[in-house]
Amino acid sequence: MTAASPPRPARVYVFATCVVDLMAPQAGLDVVGLIRRAGIAVDFPAGQSCCGQPAYTSGFNDEARRVAAAQLDLFVADQPIVVPSGSCAGMMVHHWPRLFADDAPRRAQAERIAAQVVEFSHFARDVLGLADAQGLGQAPVTRPVKVALHTSCSARREMGVHAPSRALLAALPGVEIVQQARETECCGFGGTFSARHPSISGAMVADKLAAVREAGAEVLVSADCGCLLNLHHAAQAQGGVATGQPRCQHLGSFLAERIGLAGGAWQVTD
């Protein structure tokens, strides 16, 4: 960590998100492993489920409030809440307080928790120090690999995750970051957008994967499992790595793999 880095807490919460919990649990385990590697204890409230974003972005505010309220009651201690998804972190930071604009006690609770939320890539860079040699340590995996970075729309624009994610990748020995032509564009997931408009979503993800292939990337890394699910399944439908498609991996899992922690594999529960 640099002198300007936030102090390292003794404990943190991890809010895994519903997608990680149900579809990509290894990504959550890898994030927890990286935090514990730094000597930080992890609290994982068993009752956590969803941030409420699917209902919220579909216009079902009452339903979103019920889901969000259930999460608010889980985080009682004054400690960071690490979220391995920029999209969900953005929901918690920017939209939870708005959801409870007419409920003063809940709004105060939402604002307190919003101030505790830290998106994973920021935490990994600024607190764990994984973008500098001291925090990274001697990374045992140095095999050369070309990596493209994808940040979800809300992660990039609401939470500013592009710079820390890029810094974390750049610090890893043997990793070459390649620039894909559609780096700032949506992958077509967009939460429920991919279900409501599958043909448009399919065209968008095909364009994204084509740009990644043209850049020569072997691995496509993102800190958002929603996007990764979309990208992974689209890549598999086109033949997977055997046909030149990139391997899709959560940032936490890629870091864990290169650092030498157990796990590191992108495992999707179909």
Predicted regions and their residues:
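Iron-sulfur cluster-binding electron-transfer modules in prokaryotic oxidoreductases
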Residues: 1-270
